[in-house]
Amino acid sequence: MRFINPKTDYAFKKIFGSSESKDILISFLNALIYDGNPTIEYLEIINPNLPPRVQGLKDTYLDVKAQLDDGTFVIIEMQVLNVQSFGKRVVFNAAKTYAFQLQSGEGYRMLKPVIALTLTDFEMFVNREQLISHFVYREKDDGYPYPDNEIELVFVELPKFTKELHELETLTDKWIYFIKYARSLTEIPENMDDIPELHRAFGIANQADLTPTELEDLERREMFIYDQQGAIALGIEQGREQGLEQGLEQGLEQGLEQGERQATRAIARNLLDRLDDEAIAATTGLSVEEVRELR
């Protein structure tokens, strides 16, 4: 038995965002947002459609959206690549979801809270040890919570999860282990099989139940991710080398700053054959015009 990689956009959406995934998503959100407590009892998946088949692999991310029984909107995103301005994009998507709720003539009292749950396959907060981080509005000096604290950002940094299979204790542990390691498993672990929603998630992720076309599509998506990771790593290395060389001539600080710019442009150049201009701009933080100048 082999399982598809939940960290790819198609697999993540298939497992958590399809029309038959409600119970799975409820268990998953309770585990990651509410520390395993059964806070969520019901939800509606807002966009229960799978992403289109790969056409040039231009999509850089995909999210799942749901509305809880109390009206709260939840945006769930799996992010594999540490692209420039990613943190700003998370804030933008949460704010946009909050602001775009109102129709013409509706008052602010109609607004519902928004939770943005983001899983990253990289360390987003390098100097922070916590695996799961919750960010909300609070007073700067004494931490007093803002009364209408209706936007919450929740991050799960997968590299910080280091538990082995035999060390899994909580529902949170087991769901994170599933996301991080399902691709390398050959059977459903005994200590995870007793949770019905996890068992169903493994069933959806079973490669044997996919068509050859779906498997080919998933393989291309995984290769695309690996190519992007390689291109970004190479661009960073090339930019640093160029920056250090210039640092010896111009002064270290100025050279390193120039190196960062060179790294960004090197990353963009390495992506020219793989992505369109808009996707490269979203990945690197360059403007579309700057990307076009590199072609």
List each language-model region with its residue ranges.
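Elongated, amphipathic alpha-helical interaction scaffolds
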Residues: M1-R295
